[in-house]
Design a protein with these regions (language model features):
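Chalcogenol-based redox active-site neighborhoods
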Residues: 1-148, 153-157
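Disulfide-stabilized, aromatic/cysteine-rich ligand-recognition loop
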Residues: 151-169
Length: 169
């Protein structure tokens, strides 16, 4: 599990078009999926943050076991991206679940902010309430604003809120 201040693990994962993406910093890594109501509720807020912070590389990673949850298969991910259009971040598949494990991801969503030096600076929920769009991913945005200002993140960790990651058995 990666702790606040630790060097973030590197990764290379395929997106919905089969292109590989490797971690570039500074970054926001969001473990997410296609079926969790929490992940779906926060998706637009996270996409808006990706558009508002082009100086950060955003990655959406789906680690769920697609055999038990076919709605999280690479094909279903591809269909979702095509249906919704204009995703401002690559949607990556963590088939082995190794990336989710080394980060210590627990839920969808689970957000990790990595600074330009590759260190984990924030981990947790995008904001306090998935049902309140007016919160606009405020915890994530606060962390990104602190990094932009070269300040310590005031709230470096919050409890991730969402559906448990569906681990392979």
């Amino acid at each position: 599990m990666t702790a606040i201040g630790d060097t973030a693990p590197s990764f290379t994962l395929p997106d919905t078009e089969g292109l590989d993406h490797s971690l570039e910093t500074p970054a926001v890594v969001v473990f997410t999926c296609n079926h969790c109501p929490y992940a779906l509720a926060w998706h637009d807020r996270l996409a808006a943050a990706a558009r508002d912070y082009p100086d950060f590389h955003f990655y959406a990673i789906n680690p769920n076991d697609a055999e038990r949850y076919p709605r999280d298969s690479l094909e279903a991910m591809r269909e979702r991206v095509e249906r919704e259009g204009d995703w401002p971040m690559p949607y990556l598949r963590d088939e082995s679940q190794d990336v989710a494990r080394v980060f210590g991801a627990m839920t969808t969503p689970d957000v990790f902010v990595i600074d330009a030096d590759g260190r984990l600076r924030y981990r947790g929920a995008p904001d306090p309430d998935h049902q309140d769009p007016s919160l606009d991913a405020e915890w994530l945005r606060d962390a990104l604003n602190c990094l932009r200002a070269a300040e310590d993140v005031a709230r470096p960790e919050t409890d991730p809120i969402g559906c448990s990651i569906k681990w392979k058995q």
